[in-house]
Amino acid sequence: MFTLKKSLLLLFFLGTINLSLCEEERNAEEERRDNPDERDVEVEKRFLGGLIKIVPAMICAVTKKC
C-alpha cells in the first residue's frame, strides 16, 4: 500500500510540473502575440469574414431577387 501511495504521489508531482510548464509556455506565446499590428490583422480578418457572410443577404433584401 505504501508503494502505491508513493507512486501516486510521484505521478501527481510530475503532472503538476508538466501543467506548470505548459502554462508558462502559453503565457509566453500570449506575450509574443501582444504586438498591436498582429492584433489589428486578426480583428480585420474577423470583420471581413463576417461582412462577406452578410453582404449577399443584404443584396437579396434590397433587390428582392433571391
UniProtKB/Swiss-Prot annotation:
<dbReference type="InterPro" id="IPR012520">
    <property type="entry name" value="Antimicrobial_frog_1"/>
</dbReference>
<dbReference type="GO" id="GO:0005576">
    <property type="term" value="C:extracellular region"/>
</dbReference>
<feature type="propeptide" description="Small acidic peptide">
    <location>
        <begin position="21"/>
        <end position="44"/>
    </location>
</feature>
<protein>
    <recommendedName>
        <fullName>Ranalexin</fullName>
    </recommendedName>
</protein>
<keyword id="KW-0929">Antimicrobial</keyword>
<comment type="function">
    <text>Potent microbicidal activity, active against S.aureus and E.coli. It also acts as a membrane-disruptive agent at higher concentrations.</text>
</comment>
<keyword id="KW-0354">Hemolysis</keyword>
<comment type="similarity">
    <text>Belongs to the frog skin active peptide (FSAP) family. Brevinin subfamily.</text>
</comment>
<dbReference type="Pfam" id="PF03032">
    <property type="entry name" value="FSAP_sig_propep"/>
</dbReference>
<dbReference type="GO" id="GO:0031640">
    <property type="term" value="P:killing of cells of another organism"/>
</dbReference>
<keyword id="KW-0878">Amphibian defense peptide</keyword>
<keyword id="KW-0732">Signal</keyword>
<keyword id="KW-0204">Cytolysis</keyword>
<keyword id="KW-1015">Disulfide bond</keyword>
<feature type="disulfide bond">
    <location>
        <begin position="60"/>
        <end position="66"/>
    </location>
</feature>
<dbReference type="GO" id="GO:0050830">
    <property type="term" value="P:defense response to Gram-positive bacterium"/>
</dbReference>
<keyword id="KW-0964">Secreted</keyword>
<dbReference type="InterPro" id="IPR004275">
    <property type="entry name" value="Frog_antimicrobial_propeptide"/>
</dbReference>
<dbReference type="GO" id="GO:0050829">
    <property type="term" value="P:defense response to Gram-negative bacterium"/>
</dbReference>
<dbReference type="Pfam" id="PF08018">
    <property type="entry name" value="Antimicrobial_1"/>
</dbReference>
<keyword id="KW-0044">Antibiotic</keyword>
<feature type="signal peptide">
    <location>
        <begin position="1"/>
        <end position="20"/>
    </location>
</feature>
<keyword id="KW-0165">Cleavage on pair of basic residues</keyword>
